[in-house]
Amino acid sequence: MIIYRDLISHDEMFSDIYKIREIADGLCLEVEGKMVSRTEGNIDDSLIGGNASAEGPEGEGTESTVITGVDIVMNHHLQETSFTKEAYKKYIKDYMKSIKGKLEEQRPERVKPFMTGAAEQIKHILANFKNYQFFIGENMNPDGMVALLDYREDGVTPYMIFFKDGLEMEKC
């Protein structure tokens, strides 16, 4: 399995269990997710071992809640954040500088294509700004990557967009 981590915060962003495709001439990765519901707080009797107690009513004392969300967000503990268009412009400008610096150190051949492609992609993001929800890694590092969540035309299928050059891959 491959884990994709944020190059700056080192937070886990997603893994290769999802359908991943390159978009924007290889500048970004689009990761398709699913809406899922999970029950939290419910303890399965098979995990406890032994027999269920005969002393009290069945299920007493266990409260469970059902949480519904996008599997990528829930599995990798991504945290939702919000931006005004102006705040996002400021963030993305600083983020691009950070990634450019990392690329200059590690992969100088990627600097020019990244900077050229990023400008186009940012125009596209800003043009569709109201469609997106924004997510950052578990540690909520404000300098790290902000992933974008949108839904396909069907209104049901969620997908997330990540800048490919802002990710590092870790084989597990």
From Swiss-Prot:
One Pfam family it belongs to: TCTP
GO terms of biological process kind: calcium ion transport; intracellular calcium ion homeostasis; negative regulation of apoptotic process; negative regulation of ectoderm development; negative regulation of intrinsic apoptotic signaling pathway in response to DNA damage; regulation of apoptotic process; response to virus; stem cell population maintenance
Main localisation: cytoplasm
GO molecular function: calcium ion binding; DNA-binding transcription factor binding; RNA binding
Region feature (Required for reduction of TSC22D1 protein stability): 70-172
Domain TCTP: 1-172
Xref: Gene3D superfamilies: Metal Binding Protein, Guanine Nucleotide Exchange Factor, Chain A
Induction and repression of expression: Down-regulated in response to enterovirus 71 (EV71) infection.
Tissue specificity annotation: Found in several healthy and tumoral cells including erythrocytes, hepatocytes, macrophages, platelets, keratinocytes, erythroleukemia cells, gliomas, melanomas, hepatoblastomas, and lymphomas. It cannot be detected in kidney and renal cell carcinoma (RCC). Expressed in placenta and prostate.
Subcellular location: Cytoplasm
PTM annotation (Phosphoserine): residues: S46, S53, S64
Highest taxon above the source species: Eukaryota
Sorted UniProt keywords: Calcium, Cytoplasm, Phosphoprotein
GO terms under cellular component: cytoplasm; cytoplasmic microtubule; cytosol; extracellular exosome; extracellular space; multivesicular body; nucleoplasm; nucleus
Stored PROSITE patterns: TCTP_1, TCTP_2, TCTP_3
Family annotation (InterPro entries): Mss4-like_sf, Mss4/transl-control_tumour, TCTP, Translation_control_tumour_CS, Translational_control_tumour_p
Summary of subunit composition and partner proteins: Homodimer. Interacts with STEAP3. Interacts with TSC22D1; interaction results in the destabilization of TSC22D1 protein.
Role summary: Involved in calcium binding and microtubule stabilization. Acts as a negative regulator of TSC22D1-mediated apoptosis, via interaction with and destabilization of TSC22D1 protein.
Similarity comment text for this entry: Belongs to the TCTP family.
Name by which UniProt lists this protein: Translationally-controlled tumor protein
Species this chain originates from: Homo sapiens (Human)
Lineage: Eukaryota, Metazoa, Chordata, Craniata, Vertebrata
